[in-house]
Amino acid sequence: MKQYYIVALIVIATLLLTNCKKAGSGDENPQETFDPTPLELIIPQGFPDMVIPDDNPLTVEGVALGRLLFYDEILSGNDSQSCATCHSQSFAFSDNGKQTSEGIDGIKGDRNAPAVINIGWLPSLFWDGRAKTIEEQALGPVPNPIEMHLEWTDAEI
């Protein structure tokens, strides 16, 4: 019986040792690529073409990620606000007709949140027009101390 355990230990040790690899042995692929799925945008009749930046093309995966981030409260300083808090889908992605939007910790803003429908065709965003692209606009509310109050360094994974 003792010989059986010794043989079993030798077999197990041999299997373990032959399956061990040195880090950097060449089997891993650090240049793994991801090929996102292009999203075909169907533009309604009468609408002009939408300007889509070359460095940020529409993809199925990008739209899915955007939807998740839009509804995720983790992008606020106390995990209580998402973009959808002030841009409610139930109210045409607006702030339910409120005169001023309420941000983190109940702080009232200076304006209400504009509706975010068909924004791909708008020449500028925010009420004062300071953002010229959707990508530029997305950087504003998260670190804003009245709106979501989360530093980008704290949002990084």
Describe the residue ranges of each PLM region.
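N-terminal secretory signal peptides that target proteins for export/translocation
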Residues: 1-2
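Bacterial N-terminal signal peptides
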Residues: 8-16
